[in-house]
Amino acid sequence: VIEPKCYKYEGKKCPPDINPVCGTDKRTYYNECALCVFIRQSTKKADKAIKIKKWGKC
């Protein structure tokens, strides 16, 4: 399990590159930044704890 490096994306637009990550919530995210945006925008406490399960699609 990998901690996403969300600090890299603070106040920036997500890059358009497709580099899928599989979250510990078993969802595939477009890239690490997209996962970080989801975590930041979510109001659910459980979502704040999502990590990267693996690089690539779930």
UniProtKB/Swiss-Prot annotation:
PANTHER family with a match to the protein in the record: OVOINHIBITOR-RELATED, SERINE PROTEASE INHIBITOR
Lineage of the species this protein comes from: Eukaryota, Metazoa, Chordata, Craniata, Vertebrata
Gene Ontology MF term list: endopeptidase inhibitor activity
Keyword Protease: no
Ranges of residues in domain Kazal-like: 1-58
Coiled coil: none
UniProt subunit comment: Monomer.
Organism: Phyllomedusa sauvagei (Sauvage's leaf frog)
Disulfide pairings: C6-C36, C14-C33, C22-C58
Tissue: Skin.
Protein name: Proteinase inhibitor PSKP-1
Subcellular location: Secreted
Pfam families documented for this protein: Kazal_1
